[in-house]
Regions:
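ATP-dependent carboxylate-amine ligase catalytic core
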Residues: 2-113, 117, 121-145, 157-161
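Residues that mark the start of a beta-strand
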Residues: 6, 33-37, 246-248, 274, ...
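Structural motif
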Residues: 8, 87-89, 118-120, 150, ...
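C-terminal and late-domain segments of enzyme folds
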Residues: 110, 243-245, 258-269, 274-275, ...
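A short helix->loop->beta-strand "cap" motif at the edges of active sites that frequently abuts
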Residues: 115, 172-174, 319-323
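Internal gly/pro-rich beta-alpha loop/helix module
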Residues: 127-241
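Phosphate-binding active sites in nucleotide-utilizing proteins
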Residues: 247-308, 314-319
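Cysteine-nucleophile active-site neighborhood
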Residues: 300-376
């Protein structure tokens, strides 16, 4: 067993304030000298950026559906290195997964790791009902231990005391860890894919500090530390995730291309690849000597004019002789053109015969299992991978591309073949996470 104890901060539903509480708790404990390692359940790219600000170290995703069990075990071991406590923020509601049984949920991760759950409840409009609500969650799955409850957006000391009493009546053995008051100054700005990324959030350090002040004043931090438990996951080798795209991988990294998993970049380095970074928005070229380019997802639709006019970047990618791979936003930039929210078309790299549009917004969301249709640097034809899709843009036109993947959704329903490949260039809307397990 890993000696480093951990906790999962979860909630009954999205929008309960768990990200803000997670940031405040991480920073409040760090102030006390606790070396906090942050994790995020599920595939989200944005929350880990906030966690990094709060803790000063990279946050790792632990995905109960898209990662193999040995991958999660390896990442949990990595989290425990040089840390006193692992705090994992859950995803959506505690039991929300890919189906009615909650497969792939934060509860799945809690049962697998043995980490106790702190349930953060939006208590605005609740009093005596707080007790039955928490009791219902606590009784839902004997493999998931809800060790304590936090009330968020409380209305004052009398309200907090009512909530404490309500929990004691229904769950006498569960700890009430405190009530955090309503504070609009703790709100984090949002956009179409969720929270505005950490690097673009003004005054983020002030918000984290204010959240830490609120947690320090309202929560029993000593009790929270006592509730943490080591993981049940056994020792595991470092996570491999996806094979390297090349010997030297140049990764686009800026506000338009921000969605690359730190664990994947670290895994590439462990497997012997060099990883360098460049900014298309700054009109930079991939590093000299790179034999592969990775254009990750992000927000190219918000910077499309600047990308189109980045002449050095565009010329370098069009002339690049190595392997070029794009995911989601990176896939859009590899195409012939991108139509922005105002309906204006911008010429893109023209490396794949695809036109995309952000003017006709439609949500595409869900886990995907895909089978590779051709040999590529990260896999042989027929290999399967797991990942996820989350975007509002859409394919406007295609010119008979060679397809990259045969996909199905998390329930196993077959979907239309997707992505495109041409020569040394390939991409799709799907963010790959791990090889498919046995």
């Amino acid at each position: 067993l890993s000696a480093t104890p951990g906790l999962i901060l979860a909630a009954p539903s999205s929008g309960s304030g768990k990200t803000t509480i997670a940031l405040g708790l991480m920073r409040a404990l760090a102030r006390r000298g606790v070396r906090v390692a942050a994790a995020k359940a599920g595939p989200d790219y944005i929350d880990p950026g906030f966690h990094r600000v709060a803790t000063g170290r990279a946050c790792l995703n632990l995905d109960p559906w898209a990662m193999q069990a040995q991958t999660r075990a390896g990442l949990a071991s990595e989290l425990g290195c040089d840390a006193d406590l692992i705090v994992c923020e859950g995803v959506m509601g505690l039991f929300d997964g890919i189906d009615a049984a909650g497969t792939g949920s934060s509860a799945t991760l809690a049962a697998e790791t043995g980490w106790p759950v702190l349930l953060a409840v939006d208590a605005k409009g609740l009093a005596a009902s707080f007790g039955p609500l928490v009791a219902g969650f606590a009784a839902a799955d004997p493999a998931v231990r809800i060790a304590g409850a936090i009330a968020n957006r409380t209305g004052g000391t009398r309200h907090v005391e009512l909530l404490r009493q309500a929990l004691a009546r229904r769950c006498p053995d569960m700890q009430f860890l405190g009530g955090i008051g309503r504070d609009q100054a703790l709100a984090l700005p949002e956009r179409h894919l969720g929270l505005v990324p950490a690097g673009e959030t003004p005054d983020l350090e002030r918000v984290v500090e204010r959240a830490a002040d609120a947690c320090t004043a309202a929560l029993d931090l000593d009790a929270i530390l006592r509730l943490a438990r080591p993981t049940r996951l056994g020792a595991a080798p470092p996570a491999r995730l996806l094979a390297p795209l090349g010997q030297h991988i140049a990764v686009a990294s800026d506000a338009a291309f921000a969605f690359a998993y730190p664990a994947q970049l670290a895994a590439w380095r462990r497997q012997g690849a060099e990883v360098s970074f460049f900014s298309p928005l700054a009109d930079q070229k991939p590093a000299v000597g790179a034999d592969a380019v990775f254009l990750p997802g992000g927000y190219p639709e918000l910077h499309v004019g600047k990308i189109a006019s980045a002449s050095c970047f565009v010329a370098a990618l069009r002339a690049f002789a190595g392997f070029v791979y794009g995911e989601c936003g990176g896939y859009m930039v590899l195409g012939d053109g991108l139509v922005d929210a105002d309906g204006t078309r911008h010429a893109m790299l023209g490396l794949l015969p695809v036109e995309t549009t952000f003017a006709k917004r439609k949500l595409h969301l869900g886990y995907r299992k895909v089978r590779l249709r051709a040999d590529l640097p990260f896999g042989r034809a027929g290999m399967s991978f797991r990942g996820h899709e989350f975007h509002y843009s859409a394919i406007l036109a295609e010119n008979r591309p060679e397809r990259l993947f045969d996909p199905c959704d998390a329930a196993g329903h077959t979907l239309e073949s997707c992505g495109a490949r041409r020569g040394n260039v390939a991409g799709s809307y799907i963010h790959l996470i791990d090889q498919d397990g046995p």
